[in-house]
Amino acid sequence: MASLLWGGDAGAAESERLNSHFSNLVHPRKNLRGIRSTTVPNIDGSLNTEDDDDDEDDVVDLAANSLLNKLIRQSLIESSHRVEVLQKDPSSPLYSVKTFEELRLKEELLKGIYAMGFNRPSKIQEMALPMMLAHPPQNLIAQSQSGTGKTAAFVLAMLSRVNALELFPQCLCLAPTYELALQTGRVVERMGKFCVDVEVMYAIRGNRIPRGTEVTKQIIIGTPGTVLDWCFKRKLIDLTKIRVFVLDEADVMIDTQGFSDQSIRIQRALPSECQMLLFSATFEDSVWQFAERIIPDPNVIKLRKEELTLNNIRQYYVLCENRKGKYQALCNIYGGITIGQAIIFCQTRRNAKWLTVEMMQDGHQVSLLSGELTVEQRASIIQRFRDGKEKVLITTNVCARGIDVKQVTIVVNFDLPVNQSEEPDYETYLHRIGRTGRFGKKGLAFNMIEVDKLPLLMKIQDHFNSNIKQLDPEDMDEIEKIEY
């Protein structure tokens, strides 16, 4: 296949440019004026006021988080979830595979898989691939987290059913954003590098194709609105010829205005023999209702919920008078115990920016991660943190889930997570302090609490039936006795 995406030297140069750009932000006392260009606090420590949203909670963008996890994922994750399979025909045999050779793939596809670095199927792929590659084709609804090989699985299904000699769209994949569509296309490019004459085309914003143009690419990847336009208005895609229909990131789709209705309209124009595959990271009721409307007679793969635990995390709280008191307590803790790497969570961008400047001016190597940064910038910052170039990551809720750094030993809640009703956000608390104590290790969590917020912390303690011990930040002997 011809090169379909940016990458190679250009991609490396862009990564280096981003790293260089953010070195202004993460090195103490080095070119602090560089902060201003990224809307971090001004040189004198005062805060920029151009962005009125800084006082608002930093809202998590599901699509951006999904893309971020794809960008920073370095290898496949072996999920600890138990896989549950519900077959449309319970009496039919259930197959799983341990090697790609068992799937009897075309030689060029096997070469592409191994060239990507896959040695054997992941846990999800073991169960999903026999269903996705079956003859006759079977429909599938699958729950799969980022990093488990889900994209590679449905790309393999598309490439397996494409006829390179037929020059018209045969496979259609819907993604919720332009960037996620490009990420999927990159997987098609890499896996299909040995598939001669198989090509992909992007039905995404900005890719204007004149009405009446004959589309000869076999695989179309796009966002629902543009695909709908290409199919019904511009008549570029004949949906009656589509053999494989993939709907990726369904939970993000239904979170985006109009996408679910557009996707259903596209699906209804597909032939009955078209194979339909839907993937979602979560299976809440709204996702299930959408999946059942759009995928007829499916096999279902679900992940039994992993119980996040706080048992291996020691939790403390410190009573403080104000923001400066919190910072002084943080400094005392920082000076009294050995820290590998730490993540500090703030509820608002304003507090995150203020804390970044305070720590930088005191000589700490810190980086700042918030929702105003692009996904690529966030990925660069996380990679630097993962590489140990900074020891402290200050962030809002954009980092509460899905980002695993083995060296993180301490999590600090500079602000308690609360919902719009100013009640404790229990799930966010769980995922925040879950950034430590991972991979079977013990961890520490510190909560900086103003007196009027203490009832919220007590609700959190009762909710999780856990012990959150009060810590005196002035008692250095007590701090130094803290063990992981």
Swiss-Prot record:
A motif (Q motif) lies at residues 98-126. InterPro entries: DEAD/DEAH_box_helicase_dom, Helicase_ATP-bd, Helicase_C-like, P-loop_NTPase, RNA_helicase_DEAD_Q_motif. Isoform 1 is expressed in germ cells. Isoform 2 is expressed in Leydig cells and in round spermatids of adult testis upon gonadotropin stimulation. Phosphorylated on threonine residues. The phosphorylated form is found in the cytoplasm but not in the nucleus. It is found in: Cytoplasm; Nucleus. GO terms for molecular function: ATP binding; ATP hydrolysis activity; RNA binding; RNA helicase activity. GO terms for cellular component: chromatoid body; cytoplasm; nucleus. It catalyses: ATP + H2O = ADP + phosphate + H(+). A motif (Nuclear localization signal) lies at residues 101-115. Its EC number is 3.6.4.13. A motif (Nuclear export signal) lies at residues 62-75. GO terms for biological process: mRNA export from nucleus; regulation of translation; spermatid development. A motif (DEAD box) lies at residues 248-251. The modification Phosphothreonine is found at residue 49. ATP binds at residues 144-151. Disruption phenotype: Male mice display normal sexual behavior but are sterile with testes that are 25% smaller than the wild-type. Round spermatids arrest at step 8 and fail to elongate. Chromatoid bodies are unusually condensed, greatly reduced in size and lack the typical amorphous texture throughout all steps of spermiogenesis. ATP-dependent RNA helicase. Required for mRNA export and translation regulation during spermatid development. Belongs to the DEAD box helicase family. This is ATP-dependent RNA helicase DDX25. It comes from Mus musculus (Mouse). The lineage of its organism: Eukaryota, Metazoa, Chordata, Craniata, Vertebrata. The gene is Ddx25.
